[in-house]
Amino acid sequence: MLDSKLLRGQLQEVADRLASRGFSLDVARIESLEERRKAVQTRTEQLQAERNARSKSIGQAKAKGEDIAPLMADVERMANELAAGKLELDGIQAELDGILLTIPNLPDASVPVGASEDDNVEVRRWGTPKAFDFEIKDHVALGEVSGGLDFEAAAKLSGARFAVLRGPIARLHRALAQFMINLHTGEHGYEEHYTPYLVQAPALQGTGQLPKFEEDLFKITREGEADFYLIPTAEVSLTNLVAGEILDAKQLPLKLVAHTPCFRSEAGASGRDTRGMIRQHQFDKVEMVQVVEPAKSMEALEGLTANAERVLQLLELPYRVLALCTGDMGFGAVKTYDLEVWVPSQDKYREISSCSNCGDFQARRMQARWRNPETGKPELVHTLNGSGLAVGRTLVAVLENYQQADGSILVPEVLKPYMGGVEVIR
């Protein structure tokens, strides 16, 4: 979340910057709450000073043998008023904190200003989409040729937006995840993690999914115990590993990676991408997280994005990189690059990775800090996250870009070591 000092000292500037994201900050409400907070705080401080003075007078009066009953009554009255003032102050602060939890991050000055995805800026492209000399099939039709993709069986088990993978296609899906993990751990310096797929609410609040986006999550209610949520991304579990910690400067940067299933309700996606594997309730993803010194986070974002790009380059899949505009960035990001891979059947690029610098936004929620050797004091770290990559969408891209006229699929060269001698999926 944002630093509350910004709302006290630069409220209108913050409101103007948030407006570029399409977010309307209720300035009047915040000003009203701040005025009440200051008034109550001033009153309680005055009462505390008066109470201290009265308490001192009691001792003096008692030493002189004077009647202390009126003074005692005054002190008791003030104690009651102080308790009421503290309750009121706590209520005001809780309301301000609640507002803070709903406010998105401030965009970096380098982020293009815009209202929607139409205003995103293309940064670069890699590779050239293949010109097929036959009528191409989409991944659903290709899956039917081999029998390796079965959406009907999945619907029988779980309903819409699920898939059953079989045989060589299931193995190809696994190969992709293994290849990604091996690349990031072997060449990019990440440490592999296996984390819980179920987390509690504080973890999701720490990374910004709660309270604002609860409808996008799958929740497991437990009577008498804390609720569980299925993770929407391993960003949640990986980033929260540093919650409440004070890291030594020598530990930074932390580079963490995990391969997990992800679970999303897709509450706002009704009618979109209903065919195939593009938008699923359950999908696998390899997630990269970095925890860095604040001065190095923008440089780290470029490196994180390059790590995700390397996966696509080695798979020889054409892609482009977009700098997201202010109106299209995620809730917690100060700057985001999206990677979009070429999907032949749709004749366009589709998102396959989102790489974001969240600044100290998540760290403040989680109280994740490092000890700055220059000051000797704990300070907030910066956190970054990025898909490296979404496994299901990468499978879609491989199936479609490596298809042959008969519906068979060539196995990309870098995946052959994982395929047990299978070079063509028929």
UniProtKB/Swiss-Prot annotation:
InterPro entries: aa-tRNA-synt_IIb, aa-tRNA-synth_II, aa-tRNA-synth_II/BPL/LPL, Ser-tRNA-ligase_type_1, Ser-tRNA-synth_1_N, SerRS_1_N_sf, SerRS_core, tRNA-bd_arm. L-serine binds at residues 233-235, 287, 387. Belongs to the class-II aminoacyl-tRNA synthetase family. Type-1 seryl-tRNA synthetase subfamily. Its EC number is 6.1.1.11. Pathway: Aminoacyl-tRNA biosynthesis; selenocysteinyl-tRNA(Sec) biosynthesis; L-seryl-tRNA(Sec) from L-serine and tRNA(Sec): step 1/1. NCBIfam families: serS. It is found in: Cytoplasm. Pfam families: Seryl_tRNA_N, tRNA-synt_2b. It comes from Pseudomonas putida (strain GB-1). This is Serine--tRNA ligase.
